[in-house]
Amino acid sequence: YDVDVENGTLTERSSVEVSNASHMAVSKNGKYLYSIEDEGVAVFKRDKNGDLSRINSVNIDGMRGCFLSTDVDGKYLYVAGYHDGKVTVVHTHKDGRLGSLMDGVFHTGLGSVAERNFRPHVNCVRPTPDNKYLCAVDNGIDQVKIYRVNKLRNKLELVDILRCPRESGPRIIRFSDDGKFAYILFELSNEIRAYKYDGSGKVPAFELIQTIETSAKKDVHDTHNAASGLSLANDGKHLFCTTAGEDTVSMFERDEETGMLTRKFTLPISGEYPKDLVLLPDDKHLVLANHASNTLTTFTVDYEKNIIVMNGKPIKITEPNCIRIWPVPEE
């Protein structure tokens, strides 16, 4: 899609075929787009017209992944495996090609939720902002496992485990741009936990400073609801999350000094099962991927009135899972 940032609208430009493209990530240099596919991971480049062409793909020696991220230097691609509980690291090359697998680790342990088969389900992998560690959020066993990426031995080394409440279902972790705070979204308990992060010691330190519900309703633990998406505004002053089931988006004001969150609104999103959301670069417009209703919906955010206003009709698209903004480089 072409993005009209000023008006907050999307116009379809082109498409490329990928088998089960459940998640995407843009390379650190902004030149390439990585995508999950059934066979592993694929990488694409964009021409001057915005069309995508495949560079290559790699097999990850496991079941289809569900989440992608890159390290701070752009040398590695990290893959989360929900179905097999695996964390995979793939080498990347300057010319865009995906290289060999650096390492892969299968999580072990028993979870507390029967619907998840009591098994590990890695839902998100993201490096710490200081690039010292890799956080693997395991939705099945209620843990965030923290690894050191040993570049000399080409190994993932487990250094710590952040244990979450039973049956909370951690889903996504995001860090503030200054690297001082981490926010974890919990799918089953429908809450966000804020942590102070300090990577200066021998092991990383995560200090819990706040727990806040994703929904404004009294019965936040309604089993029909599932916290699903988490996004920080580009200026770092607000945090947004979605809750499937009740199908809402919530906005929180973020204190940049303390990292604490204050709810500003929880509003309906005119779609079903909002799996992902993203702010446009101006932070004035919000785009949501509504998986069950097969739509994208766009909104203008009014920060003074604490409301969102829908921009036009929903855009039809089959079972959207992930949205990424890919800026066009300035010539």
Residue ranges of each PLM-predicted region?
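A short beta-strand motif characteristic of beta-propeller blades
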Residues: 11-17, 53-59, 109-115, 157-163, ...
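Blade-loop segments of beta-propeller domains
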Residues: 12-74
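Beta-rich, blade/repeat-based domains predominating
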Residues: 18-28, 61-72, 108-129, 164-179, ...
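Short loop/turn segments immediately following the C-termini of beta-strands
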Residues: 38, 82, 92, 139-140, ...
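Asp-box/WD-like beta-propeller blade repeats and closely related beta-sheet repeat scaffolds
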Residues: 53-124
